[in-house]
């Protein structure tokens, strides 16, 4: 930080805490007592987490300044299936020790309430830290991160054919026994059947398959979140407010404006939902009639699609056991 910024930051957070009783912040210092990382969450973020904490996404892809420091954010879906922010931090680096501090601080802020599922990048330090701090929580690897990492690690081999094969493994392979066959097909079609050990990134990706392939992910509650759509949309939103040449003081000012804009958009959606009648294509279904008035249009549309899909299946009784088959 430039001279004087540390003092300004601490003053900023002290004023926030005085004006907002529920405002929570913590500062990590290094060996010489300099500020290293900063976490904060206001009362509304804490309330939103208490409401929408089942599935969250952790993102560090947005870089806040010319020193390439990451803005870390916990995000989730609100009742309109739009991004909602639960807490943020400016991190000095992306080591396991820094992630440990951030996750412990976040949970302390949220009364140690853990989510059911957390989506993250496949960085080794992050995987280690999440496994350590979020014990008992399913951690999925975001497919968007996988695609970005594939481009960095595989170069020209990460072409359209490869991404078609990877997308199939992520979303369409629903049986663990089928995974190896489809993986071998990808290696044959895209890598000329070369051993997986020739590609370090593929070794790591295969090792962590239970965190990203539908064959395993289907057993966990994900609220329909398989990619980093939350992170992508929030990063695009951030770029409209934050620039790399902003000073730390200007950053916090613009960040607060951005958060308020997100909340204004949510209030607008709440107003429209209260004034709009949600369309139900199954008026004779007791199930659909019972939920149509309880959900926002966006959430009901998600349920509606799942209900549509249910008609693709039937059951047959076979030797006393029930099993499902698709038409």
Language-model features and meaning:
Residues 1-40, 44-47, 131-140, 147-327:
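Hydrophobic, aromatic-enriched, well-ordered structural segments
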Residues 81-85, 145:
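Short Cys/His-based metal-binding microdomains
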